[in-house]
């Protein structure tokens, strides 16, 4: 049998085997270089993470856990997973860690499976008030398999009112209380959540997917002393590969391991786990902590500049809660003729990437929304200064006011090209 044709496909580079996909990679690299990435859930991973994720570990199947696999030949990938586990435990001071979840949503599903029974009552922040799909949204597994009740933000302050959370918990007696968010710009009171959970006999699960990097840097309260289980993604503020992990008190370790495998997944992605290990090592560095500090300061700079722009206020556009304590800014358009989708598209037109986002008590549908979410992590990773973030905020304001869009695009491109990303990177 002549294997020559396949052998060529096996050893040839991507541009030879599949030029169409090679072109997609080139186009995306160009987009990332020339746009100002301000989606709060995105970041740029270090080149070392790209290398780990694109490694020969892709080839290895490893169902089970280190030193207890269902396949042979796992002695090398065991080393990678053991490193990832020990590093993330040390990083956050946790008794237990599982680094196998393919995503944050998978980690969340496993957390619920480990903590409670199908059909039981769970309680989390409502989606359009800043929660996440997996915290009880009706179309999600969390809303289909569990009886979900949701707490809302105070209509005046747009903050979580812990007295209201307590009243809701006493009324519904959930088995799991969820503290966490995808769009909330202030700190959570984990001690108060713990007190409420204890009062009603609930488990406390914290989803720190968005703020894990801030916790690692000591710039956001740690949920570890208070929560029974903590879930997170490894991207966003952690700037690692796309994936998830679970931290917990030791007593929940066995249930979580079973919930992840075989409960939610089969074989883990060992190349991604190796990349997670790299991310956890980087996150323990002083340079990472400094970057997180700048990330928050940059978000505050953007919030202040946009919030103080009288031209936007005259159009009914403001900053939700008047500022931020985290890596994101929520631009509130509920009183404006402009909607979130229009704002997102205008910013994309000038080379700034954001996402539209529902606001508390939003009257517009989710595909339109009354706000946009702006994040600073990716641009801080690129090296922008606070003065440059001030200019970026001015670009955003002018774009939302439709003032000389070609000029705003030129300004954004100049800033982007001042801070090149992945210089000299060979993708194939």
Swiss-Prot record:
<dbReference type="GO" id="GO:0035999">
    <property type="term" value="P:tetrahydrofolate interconversion"/>
</dbReference>
<dbReference type="InterPro" id="IPR049943">
    <property type="entry name" value="Ser_HO-MeTrfase-like"/>
</dbReference>
<dbReference type="InterPro" id="IPR019798">
    <property type="entry name" value="Ser_HO-MeTrfase_PLP_BS"/>
</dbReference>
<comment type="pathway">
    <text>Amino-acid biosynthesis; glycine biosynthesis; glycine from L-serine: step 1/1.</text>
</comment>
<dbReference type="InterPro" id="IPR001085">
    <property type="entry name" value="Ser_HO-MeTrfase"/>
</dbReference>
<keyword id="KW-0663">Pyridoxal phosphate</keyword>
<comment type="subunit">
    <text>Homodimer.</text>
</comment>
<dbReference type="GO" id="GO:0019264">
    <property type="term" value="P:glycine biosynthetic process from serine"/>
</dbReference>
<keyword id="KW-0028">Amino-acid biosynthesis</keyword>
<comment type="pathway">
    <text>One-carbon metabolism; tetrahydrofolate interconversion.</text>
</comment>
<feature type="binding site">
    <location>
        <begin position="131"/>
        <end position="133"/>
    </location>
    <ligand>
        <name>(6S)-5,6,7,8-tetrahydrofolate</name>
    </ligand>
</feature>
<protein>
    <recommendedName>
        <fullName>Serine hydroxymethyltransferase</fullName>
        <ecNumber>2.1.2.1</ecNumber>
    </recommendedName>
</protein>
<dbReference type="Pfam" id="PF00464">
    <property type="entry name" value="SHMT"/>
</dbReference>
<feature type="modified residue" description="N6-(pyridoxal phosphate)lysine">
    <location>
        <position position="236"/>
    </location>
</feature>
<feature type="site" description="Plays an important role in substrate specificity">
    <location>
        <position position="235"/>
    </location>
</feature>
<keyword id="KW-0963">Cytoplasm</keyword>
<dbReference type="InterPro" id="IPR015421">
    <property type="entry name" value="PyrdxlP-dep_Trfase_major"/>
</dbReference>
<dbReference type="InterPro" id="IPR015422">
    <property type="entry name" value="PyrdxlP-dep_Trfase_small"/>
</dbReference>
<feature type="binding site">
    <location>
        <position position="127"/>
    </location>
    <ligand>
        <name>(6S)-5,6,7,8-tetrahydrofolate</name>
    </ligand>
</feature>
<comment type="similarity">
    <text>Belongs to the SHMT family.</text>
</comment>
<dbReference type="GO" id="GO:0005829">
    <property type="term" value="C:cytosol"/>
</dbReference>
<dbReference type="InterPro" id="IPR039429">
    <property type="entry name" value="SHMT-like_dom"/>
</dbReference>
<keyword id="KW-0554">One-carbon metabolism</keyword>
<dbReference type="GO" id="GO:0030170">
    <property type="term" value="F:pyridoxal phosphate binding"/>
</dbReference>
<keyword id="KW-0808">Transferase</keyword>
<comment type="function">
    <text>Catalyzes the reversible interconversion of serine and glycine with tetrahydrofolate (THF) serving as the one-carbon carrier. This reaction serves as the major source of one-carbon groups required for the biosynthesis of purines, thymidylate, methionine, and other important biomolecules. Also exhibits THF-independent aldolase activity toward beta-hydroxyamino acids, producing glycine and aldehydes, via a retro-aldol mechanism.</text>
</comment>
<dbReference type="GO" id="GO:0004372">
    <property type="term" value="F:glycine hydroxymethyltransferase activity"/>
</dbReference>
<dbReference type="InterPro" id="IPR015424">
    <property type="entry name" value="PyrdxlP-dep_Trfase"/>
</dbReference>
């Amino acid at each position: 049998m002549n294997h020559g044709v396949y052998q060529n496909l096996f050893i040839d580079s991507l541009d030879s085997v599949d030029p169409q996909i090679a072109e997609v990679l080139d186009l995306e690299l160009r987009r990332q270089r020339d746009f100002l990435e301000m989606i709060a859930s995105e970041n740029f991973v270090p080149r070392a993470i790209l290398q780990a994720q694109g490694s020969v570990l892709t080839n290895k199947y490893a169902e089970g856990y280190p030193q207890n696999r269902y396949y042979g030949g796992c002695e090398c990938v065991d080393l990678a997973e053991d490193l990832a586990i020990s590093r993330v435990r040390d990083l956050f001071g946790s008794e237990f860690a599982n680094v196998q979840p393919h995503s944050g949503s998978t980690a969340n599903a496993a957390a619920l499976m480990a903590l409670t029974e199908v059909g039981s009552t769970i309680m989390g922040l409502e989606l359009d008030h800043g929660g996440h799909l997996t915290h009880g949204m009706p179309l999600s597994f969390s809303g289909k398999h569990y009886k979900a009740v949701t707490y809302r933000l105070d209509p005046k302050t747009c903050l979580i009112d812990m007295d209201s959370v307590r009243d809701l918990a006493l009324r519904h007696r959930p088995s799991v209380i969820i503290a966490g968010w995808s769009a909330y710009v202030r700190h959570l009171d984990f001690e108060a959540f713990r007190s409420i959970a204890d009062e009603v006999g609930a488990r406390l699960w914290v989803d720190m997917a968005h703020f894990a990097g801030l916790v690692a840097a000591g710039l956001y309260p740690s949920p570890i002393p208070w929560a029974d289980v903590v879930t997170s993604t490894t991207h966003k503020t952690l700037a690692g590969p796309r994936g998830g992990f679970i931290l917990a008190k030791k007593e929940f370790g066995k249930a979580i391991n079973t919930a992840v495998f075989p409960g939610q997944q089969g074989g883990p992605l060992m190349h991604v786990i190796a990349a997670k290990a790299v991310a956890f090592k980087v996150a323990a560095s002083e340079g990472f902590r400094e970057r997180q500090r700048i990330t928050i300061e940059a978000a505050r700079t953007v919030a202040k500049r946009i919030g103080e722009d009288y031209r936007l206020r005259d159009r009914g556009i403001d900053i939700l809660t008047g500022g931020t304590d985290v890596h994101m800014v929520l631009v509130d358009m509920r009183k404006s003729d402009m909607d979130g989708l229009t704002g997102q598209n205008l910013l994309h037109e000038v080379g700034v990437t954001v996402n539209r986002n529902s606001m508390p008590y939003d009257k517009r549908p989710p595909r339109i929304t009354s706000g946009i979410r702006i994040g600073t992590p990716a641009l801080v990773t690129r090296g922008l200064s606070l003065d440059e973030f001030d200019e970026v905020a001015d670009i955003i304001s002018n774009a939302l006011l439709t003032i000389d869009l070609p000029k705003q695009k030129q300004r954004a491109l100049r800033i982007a090209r001042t801070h090149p990303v992945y210089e000299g990177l060979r993708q194939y």
